[in-house]
Amino acid sequence: TVDTQLHIYEEIIRRHNRPKRDRDGVVICGAYGRGNAGDDAILEAILQEMRSIDPDMPITVLTKDPKATRLTYRVRTAGRMDVGTWKKAMRHAGLYINGGGSLIQDVTSRRSLWFYLHNIQAAHKAGCKVQMYGCGIGPVLREQHRKLAASVLNASVDVITLREPDSLKELQSMGVTKPEILLTADPAL
């Protein structure tokens, strides 16, 4: 319709006129692009919050299915294993969000834990502020994983928001003390 086309045109003009910054936008990483309704709801909640702050904020989502995520959520995407693309996005973004779900755990896979910890560290080294958003933490069973997670989170994360008290206890038992830690709620609810 004419209204739809006018809206698209206005959005393009607004984005074009948006002030340019050296570091701008956000990179969001979670278990996205897998067809899981819970993870999709978390991503939708994060995107709504980011767009309420700035509707034209550049957003890049690391996802298993870049095309579907790009079309569904109208965001830039990078494949989870496309390291060059997501590291480039991190160098330009001001914020990295590791978000939603229980990503910091070693029960389902140690590779998953290493992946998320590596990305957190890479975002910090790239100059992003790092937030863990609406997370569940644990269980992290292996002692070497607990030490690694505590080391990375203490050194690389600026703020952690948790979705339940057990996650706070898990972080405390691991010795995570440096980032600001807030008990909030599941972002999908």
Enumerate the predicted regions with their spans:
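Aromatic- and Gly/Pro-rich donor/ligand-binding loops
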Residues: 18-141, 188-189
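A nucleotide-sugar donor-handling region in carbohydrate enzymes
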Residues: 142-189
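A charged, aromatic-enriched C-terminal amphipathic alpha-helix characteristic of glycosyltransferases
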Residues: 1-16
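Residue-level recognition of hydrophobic positions within alpha-helical transmembrane segments
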Residues: 1, 35-36, 182
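Generic alpha-helical structural signal
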Residues: 3-6, 44, 165
